[in-house]
Curated annotation (Swiss-Prot):
Organism of provenance: Xylella fastidiosa (strain 9a5c)
The protein's name in its UniProt record: Chaperone protein ClpB
Residue runs in coiled coils: 391-525
Region (NBD1) residue spans: 159-340
Gene: clpB
GO BP of this protein: cellular response to heat; protein refolding
């Protein structure tokens, strides 16, 4: 017998049989070794063949083990194993059967048939397990499908559809697919294309997350329920598993063989199967090697002949990039565009999916949560599509509630930690013998007893609440299963089963659920089991950093006293503070225009009056950190070509993949304050980019992605008109300020285009600072010095005369508050640093600062 005349599967089984014989200390390979190896072979056809023929495989497995145990063993020396005479005889019989059926190679099924016909112990065991020659022959005919074995790998190509596809109709029958709500137009269009005589292969095209795969799942459910035209009623919908097709294809041609096997099986089914290829673009180039044919080219003939009835799905970008380039492949498919559903449609979809998600997480999802998931995801998550992003929000919010149910409540956890702490103290006090320690131990025992009782009561409440929730969840699962059984009975037209479920099982379960729900009616103290709009808003806030959640009382008060908080840091600019505060309040209460930035301002005024400082104060107020402010120095964008740095270089230029400076910062932090400092120094083309941001709250970067600016506050600062402000400064009357603002606006209108100025929410002209305000600023700036000294455990005490001196030295109507910083450095910080180095002041001292002879003097208190 020639080994090279066996199929590769049969050769592997023979090698496994040899290993089995060696492992059991047998010197001869008997037919039972080979049969055991064939039965245990991963992906082999022997076990499915026997099951098809009605053989009791577990019983056969037991008989084979008994025969193996009864074989003689040789131990103590290494011997060569060799095939027995009986095995050689069976192989000759197998070879004869293969030749009779026109096979070039011996396949494992002929060995099984030879064993059934044999009078030996193995044949008797097989027949005892229920094997009959006629049934085995019928099963072989069905397995082979009229084909002969002409290649070594012929066995591996069998049952290709079972190996490399997922049966969506079977999954729909067993209720494993989520319900598909809406999308009737797209499903109808898909059915329409499938019913065509030629080019009956639809390809679903749409953005990621709009529900292309869901449409195919909806079609599978309609086929199962018989809600399709006559031509599609008996068809199976299979999804191609490209990963399984490629995995393990080590040698050249192996992938092509597998795909050919799938196509052959489809041809045999004669149009009874529709193949769904998700991510269709992956077929173009799959398996491509030097000189080899890729999967896309292998599909073309089958598509042209009509042997392959196919539905594809891919995104718009990938369709353009891969499919449109291959005109021959593109013309064999008919496009079906899948658009993003509206918010109303998304709400309907979520309502349909609600039960599945509620059952999975064991929580209750309220209707306001569903509406919030659709509306908030549409407004705040702009880089993804509905309904995918709304479903994700609902899923994550439910997961969060489930996690809180399963973990210990905070109150219980705090009590447990306190108990552990007290018990550790008790163990320590037990070692002490004095009376005071004994008294403390007695007090501690009482405290532990009280806390223990409180902890036990709370734990009991928590466990009972949790058990009540779990009971309701189990009943809901039973109801869901009963509904699936009812649908299955309806398809089988089993009316007895239908009436039993509909009028017996379901009403009883629903009665149990009502009873369980009534038990839950009392408010849970420790466990929350409802997903509300507030939970959805919190998830949105976590994802985007945008404060969407309901304002707490503390935040309301904070926003109402915003002017006072900002005024403590920015002195003398009440109008600017009021304008900015109003914009923030509009944004947080949801009254601002949803299609524009929260606020866009142009701050004008001379240097050093607090334009940039107000932005820093605002960033700290909103985000508790100055780092949340996106500061862009516009003097860096004076050249025409530097505009590309803001939105990213165009294709073909260096840095294309890196994205733009402004767009990337806002994509990462959509809720931020953008400060465009010294805006008048930028090139005029920069303002053309800003027009889009100020009007629509969006900007398209160099890679074509839309960046959302609707939750940002945009502040531009400029020194334009500072000369006019200086000329008219000194008199702080409203008339002079109005005159000054008009003069400044003339300069601004001469520099900026009307369409730019017209898009701004407000243009604020800052007031020049007077001496009294400089003194206030000196007090604010000295707070920073006091903090730095506190790190060295030193205190600072300035009298009014010292503060007056610093204010006088630091006052300059032209330069604003900046000279004050220099005055504090030269008059106070420099001499104080020398005194500290000379150890005139050490840790714990208070530095008293006074004035003597027009200079600051230092004394230790």
């Amino acid at each position: 017998m020639r080994m090279d005349k066996l199929t590769s599967r049969f050769q592997n089984a023979l090698a496994d049989a040899q290993s089995l014989a060696v492992g059991r200390d047998h010197t001869i390979i008997e037919p039972v070794h080979v049969f055991s190896a064939l039965l245990d072979q991963q992906g082999g056809s022997t076990r499915p063949l026997l099951m098809q023929a009605g053989v009791n495989v577990p019983l056969l497995r037991e008989r084979l083990t008994e025969i193996l145990e009864a074989l003689p063993k040789v131990s103590g020396q290494t011997v060569n194993v060799s095939p027995s005479n009986e095995l050689s005889r069976l192989f000759h019989r197998t070879d004869k059967l293969a030749q009779q059926h026109g096979d070039q190679f011996m396949a494992s099924e002929w060995f099984v048939l030879a064993v059934v016909d044999d009078s030996g112990g193995l044949g008797q065991a097989l027949r005892a397990a229920g094997a009959e020659k006629k049934k085995i022959e019928a099963a072989i005919d069905k397995l082979r499908g009229g084909e002969t074995v002409q290649t070594e790998n012929a066995e591996e190509q069998r049952q290709a559809l079972e190996k490399y596809t997922i049966d969506l109709t079977a999954r729909a029958e067993s209720g494993k697919l989520d319900p598909v709500i809406g999308r009737d137009e797209e499903i109808r269009r898909t059915i329409q294309v499938l019913q065509r005589r030629t080019k009956n292969n639809p390809v679903l095209i749409g953005e990621p997350g709009v529900g292309k795969t869901a449409i195919v799942e909806g079609l599978a459910q309609r086929i199962v329920n018989g809600e399709v035209p006559e031509g599609l009623r008996s068809k199976r919908l299979l999804s191609l598993d490209l990963g399984a097709l490629i995995a393990g294809a080590k040698f050249r041609g192996e992938f092509e063989e597998r795909l050919k096997g799938v196509l052959n099986d489809l041809a045999k089914n004669e149009g009874r199967v529709i193949l769904f290829i998700d991510e269709l673009h992956t077929m173009v180039g799959a398996g491509k090697a030097d000189g080899a044919m890729d999967a896309g080219n292998m599909l073309k003939p089958a598509l042209a002949r009509g042997e392959l009835h196919c539905i594809g799905a891919t995104t718009l970008d990938e369709y353009r990039k891969y499919i449109e380039k291959d005109a021959a492949l593109e013309r064999r498919f008919q496009k079906v565009f899948v658009g993003e559903p509206t918010v109303e449609d998304t709400i309907a979809i979520l309502r349909g999916l609600k039960e599945k998600y509620a059952l999975h997480h064991g929580v209750e999802i309220t209707d306001p949560a569903i509406v919030a998931a659709a509306t908030l995801s549409n407004r705040y998550i702009t880089d993804r599509q509905l309904p995918d992003k709304a479903i994700d929000l609902m899923d994550e919010a439910a997961s969060r509630i489930r996690m809180e149910i399963d973990s210990k409540p905070e109150e219980l956890d705090r009590l447990e930690r306190r108990l552990i702490q007290l018990k550790i103290q008790r163990e320590m006090l037990k070692k002490e013998k004095d009376e005071a320690s004994k008294q403390r131990l007695a007090d501690l025992e009482r405290d532990i007893e009280v806390l223990d009782r409180e902890f036990s009561d709370l734990e009991e409440v928590w466990r009972s609440e949790k058990a009540a929730l779990q009971g309701a969840t189990k009943i809901k699962e039973s109801i869901e299963q009963a509904k699936l059984d009812l649908e299955a009975a309806q398809r089988r037209q089993d009316y007895a089963k239908m009436s039993e479920i509909q009028y017996g099982v379901l009403p009883a379960l629903e009665k149990q659920l009502v009873a369980a729900s009534q038990a839950e009616q009392h408010d849970f103290t420790l466990v929350q089991e409802k997903v509300t709009a507030e939970e959805i808003a919190e998830v949105v806030s976590r994802w985007t950093g945008i404060p969407v959640s309901k304002m707490l009382e503390g935040e309301r008060d904070k926003l109402l006293r915003m002017e006072a908080d900002l005024g403590r840091r920015v002195v003398g600019q009440e109008e600017a503070i009021k304008v900015v505060s109003d914009a923030v309040r509009r944004s947080r209460t949801g009254l601002s225009d949803p299609n524009r930035p929260s606020g866009s301002f142009l701050f004008l005024g001379p240097t050093g009056v607090g334009k940039t400082e107000l932005c820093k104060a605002l960033a700290e107020f909103l985000f508790d950190s100055q780092d949340a402010m996106v500061r862009i120095d516009m003097s860096e964008f004076m050249e025409k070509h530097s505009v590309a740095r803001l939105i990213g270089a165009p294709p073909g230029y260096v840095g294309y993949e890196e994205g733009g400076y402004l767009t990337e910062l806002v994509r990462r932090r959509p809720y931020s304050l953008i400060l465009l400092d010294e805006v008048e120094k930028a090139h005029s083309d920069v303002f053309n980019i800003l027009l889009q941001v100020l009007d629509d709250g969006r900007l398209t970067d160099g890679q074509g992605r839309t960046v959302d600016f609707r939750n940002t506050v945009i502040v531009m600062t400029s020194n334009l008109g500072s000369h006019q402000i200086q000329e008219l400064s000194g008199d702080d009357s409203p008339e002079v300020y109005t005159q000054m603002k008009a003069a400044v606006m003339e300069v601004v209108q001469a520099h900026f285009r009307p369409e730019f100025i017209n898009r701004l929410d407000d243009i604020v002209v800052f007031h020049p600072l007077d001496k009294a305000q400089i003194k206030q600023i000196a007090r604010i700036q000295l707070q920073g010095l006091e903090k730095r000294l506190a790190e060295s455990e030193l205190k600072l005490d300035l009298d009014d005369r010292a503060l007056e001196l610093l204010g006088n030295v630091g006052f300059d109507p032209v330069y604003g508050a900046r000279p004050l910083k220099r005055a504090i450095q030269s008059q106070l910080e420099n001499p104080l640093a020398q005194q500290i180095l000379a150890e005139a002041f050490v840790s714990g001292d208070t530095v008293q600062v006074g004035v003597d002879g027009g200079k600051l003097v230092f004394a230790k208190v």
